Amino acid sequence: MSATVIREDGAYHSFCGLTCVGWLYQKIKDSFFLVLGTHTCAHLLQNVLGVMVFARPRFGVALIEEADLSKQQPELNAIIDEIVADHHPSVIFLLSSCTPEVMKVEFDGLARAVSRPNLPVLFVPASGLDYTFSQAEDSVLQALLPFCPVAPADDRRVVFLGSVNDAIADDFHTEAARLGIPVAGFLPESHFRDLPPIGPGTVVAPLQPYLAKVAGRLARERGATVMTSLFPFGPDGTRAFWEDLAAAMGKAVDLSERERQAWERLEPHLEILRGKKVFFTADNLMELPLARFLRNAGCIILECSSPYINRKFHARELAALDGVRVVEQPNFDRQLRDIRALRPDLVISTLATTNPLVGHGVVAKWSTEFSFMPIQGWSGAATLAGMFTRPLKRHAQLDPLMDDPLWVAGLMPG
């Protein structure tokens, strides 16, 4: 059995795809992310990512001014020269934003025009008109795919799909070695020149639930086998992930004792989570595995909503959520009414709606944070659990009088 997906009429898009820069520029250490956008894009990146300009981060915004509206194509050569002189990148990602998309800028041609012999400039569609913010990583990985060497058919190794920090990557390498699973690498790797070979013998193991498109391309264009499993979030997901990966490589492993020990280490968090009612609004495409983890941790999932659900890519997660109300493209007005009626203990909500919910006395958590945190695998389980328990513990320490509507009367919209 599998959870029945209810589809409503809410917005498919939740937050700007440009924010994928926040974790990807740190992952791909010889890259530069150049956004063609407006002052709004620049303010978004600086404020959301919290990086000051004088820190000289490896991302920037080529600003579109009013005079550019009459030009056929923006002039970027001088900006590329400056990036090369200051940062010496091996690859530059040129990200689209809403305004140049509306202007019909021909990004593919623009990227080719400013590429150098030893410095590819790769177009990445990341506009909020087309993608949720986590899906923009999918676009970056699709841009990298042509630069992955073609592996021979007899090269039977694993490629982990999705960006994770170096500590989590080391954890996956260590666990694979312990289980005797040969690894070709990660997509993306820490350096552009180290991209893994991918071919018909490759087993692709997705680490993130928002990479359905690039996974499909790897299967179609390279003949790779894309593993279908739970995503490695929490002890339950991590056990299933490694057991299924071992099976795909012709090995049989039993990690039940490893899972039991992992849950045991999480007991201080589980004491807080058991019996709590949790409501997911839609934001980052990570809702399904997060809800599955919480359900197995003892929570009651009132609703798990996501902007987009891929029935094939998310099949195992949907099966694990059988009996849970799962909604695609939820109507937020309806959700507000349900939150008011059901009174959840915790709401996982968007950056834009969390503070207003808190203003109405709801205990809420930014869903945006999960994309930036090391929550995968055995080593990430405690971080994952802590992200749910922290707002609950913080609220429990507040004076009960702070929940009185008097404190927000007239401040928050009704």
UniProtKB/Swiss-Prot annotation:
Binding site for [4Fe-4S] cluster: C16, C41, C98
Reactions the enzyme catalyzes: chlorophyllide a + oxidized 2[4Fe-4S]-[ferredoxin] + 2 ADP + 2 phosphate = protochlorophyllide a + reduced 2[4Fe-4S]-[ferredoxin] + 2 ATP + 2 H2O
Keyword set, alphabetical order: 4Fe-4S, ATP-binding, Bacteriochlorophyll biosynthesis, Chlorophyll biosynthesis, Iron, Iron-sulfur, Metal-binding, Nucleotide-binding, Oxidoreductase, Photosynthesis
E.C. code: 1.3.7.7
Single GO term (MF): ATP binding
Pfam family name, one: Oxidored_nitro
Associated pathway: Porphyrin-containing compound metabolism; bacteriochlorophyll biosynthesis (light-independent)
InterPro entries: LIPOR_BchN/ChlN, Nase/OxRdtase_comp1, Protochl_reductN
SUPFAM superfamilies registered for this protein in UniProt: Helical backbone' metal receptor
Group of enzyme by EC: oxidoreductase
Cofactor remark from the record: Binds 1 [4Fe-4S] cluster per heterodimer. The cluster is bound at the heterodimer interface by residues from both subunits.
HAMAP family assigned: ChlN_BchN
Assembly behavior: Protochlorophyllide reductase is composed of three subunits; BchL, BchN and BchB. Forms a heterotetramer of two BchB and two BchN subunits.
Protein name: Light-independent protochlorophyllide reductase subunit N
Organism: Roseiflexus castenholzii (strain DSM 13941 / HLO8)
